C-alpha cells in the first residue's frame, strides 16, 4: 500500500502542478486503533510556484485529492500550514509526529525543527478539549453508544491530560496514552476493546457505560478549568515563519 500511496502523491503533484514537501498517515492507522478494513488517511503539505502566491485573487489553499473506501487523501498549502503553526494548531504537530511518513524533504524537516518555537500547551490543550466536548455532546447522550467512539473521545481527553501534566508534545499512539495517562480502573477495559477493534472490522454498539462516561465528562470539565487558569504565552513573532517561507520559495 505504501507504494500505491506514493504513486498517488506523484500523480497529484503532476496534475495540480505543486510540490509536496511532507506526507504522512494521519488517522486511525497512525493512532493505532485501526481495524483490517480501515481506510488510509493521507495528509500532505504542498507548495506552488512562487508566482502563484503573488496573484491578487485568493488561491486555493487545500486539495481534496481522493476520498473513497480505501484512501482519503487531502493536502494543505504551506502558507495555510504556517498560519496554523503560528496558532499552535495541534493537527500540524500530529502530522510531524506520525509514525508513517510517505514523503519527507529537506523543507519538511526544516519546518519540523521550527514547530517547537510555536508550541503552546494552552492552545493545544484547549483545542483537544473543545473537540472532546463536541464529541461528547454529539455521540454520548444515547442509550447505546458506538464503542469505537470511546477511542476518539478518550484520545482527545488523554492528549489534553498529557499536555497539562507533562507540558510536551504527546505521543501519537493511543495505547501509549492509555497506559500512561488513563486512570487504572479503566485501563484493562479500554485495552480489551482496543484489542477487539484491531482484530475485527468494527465493534458495533453497546449500552452506554455510565461510570466511564461520567469519568470522562468530569475529567473534561476539570481540565477545562485548568486550561483557563494557565497564563497566556503572549504573542509570538512571525519572523521565523516568514523567513522559512521565503527560503522555500526561492
Residue spans for each PLM region:
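General structural signal for secondary-structure boundaries
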Residues: 1, 49, 77, 120, ...
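Alpha-helix boundary/capping detector
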Residues: 46, 68, 107-111, 179
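Glycine-centered secondary-structure boundary/capping sites
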Residues: 17, 166, 183, 249-250
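Metal-dependent nucleotidyltransferase catalytic core
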Residues: 1-20, 24-37, 43-95
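Acidic, carboxylate-rich catalytic segments that either coordinate divalent cations
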Residues: 232-250
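Conserved nucleotidyltransferase catalytic core and NTase-mimicking acidic/glycine-rich helix/loop elements
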Residues: 113-237
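Glycogenin-like
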Residues: 82-121
Amino acid at each position: 500500500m505504501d507504494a500505491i500511496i506514493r504513486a498517488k502523491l506523484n500523480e497529484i503533484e503532476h496534475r495540480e502542478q505543486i510540490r509536496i514537501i511532507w506526507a504522512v498517515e494521519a488517522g486511525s492507522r497512525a493512532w493505532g486503533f485501526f481495524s483490517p478494513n480501515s481506510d488510509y488517511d493521507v495528509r500532505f503539505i504542498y507548495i506552488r510556484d512562487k508566482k502563484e502566491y503573488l496573484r491578487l485573487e485568493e488561491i486555493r489553499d487545500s486539495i481534496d485529492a481522493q476520498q473513497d473506501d480505501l484512501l482519503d487523501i487531502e493536502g494543505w498549502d504551506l502558507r495555510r500550514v504556517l498560519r496554523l503553526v503560528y496558532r499552535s494548531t495541534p493537527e500540524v504537530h500530529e502530522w510531524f509526529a506520525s509514525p508513517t511518513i510517505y514523503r519527507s524533504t529537506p523543507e519538511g524537516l526544516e519546518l519540523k525543527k521550527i514547530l517547537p518555537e510555536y508550541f503552546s500547551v494552552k492552545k493545544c490543550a484547549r483545542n483537544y478539549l473543545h473537540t472532546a466536548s463536541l464529541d461528547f455532546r454529539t455521540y454520548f447522550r444515547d442509550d447505546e453508544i458506538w464503542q469505537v467512539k470511546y477511542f476518539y473521545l478518550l484520545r482527545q481527553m488523554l492528549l489534553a491530560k498529557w499536555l497539562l501534566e507533562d507540558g510536551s508534545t504527546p505521543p501519537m499512539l493511543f495505547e501509549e496514552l492509555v497506559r500512561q495517562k488513563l486512570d487504572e480502573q479503566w485501563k484493562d477495559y479500554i485495552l480489551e476493546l482496543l484489542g477487539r477493534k484491531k482484530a475485527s472490522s468494527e465493534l458495533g454498539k453497546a449500552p452506554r457505560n455510565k461510570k466511564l462516561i461520567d469519568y470522562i465528562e468530569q475529567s473534561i470539565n476539570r481540565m477545562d478549568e485548568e486550561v483557563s487558569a494557565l497564563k497566556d504565552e503572549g504573542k509570538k513573532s512571525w519572523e521565523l515563519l516568514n523567513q522559512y517561507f521565503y527560503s522555500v520559495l526561492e
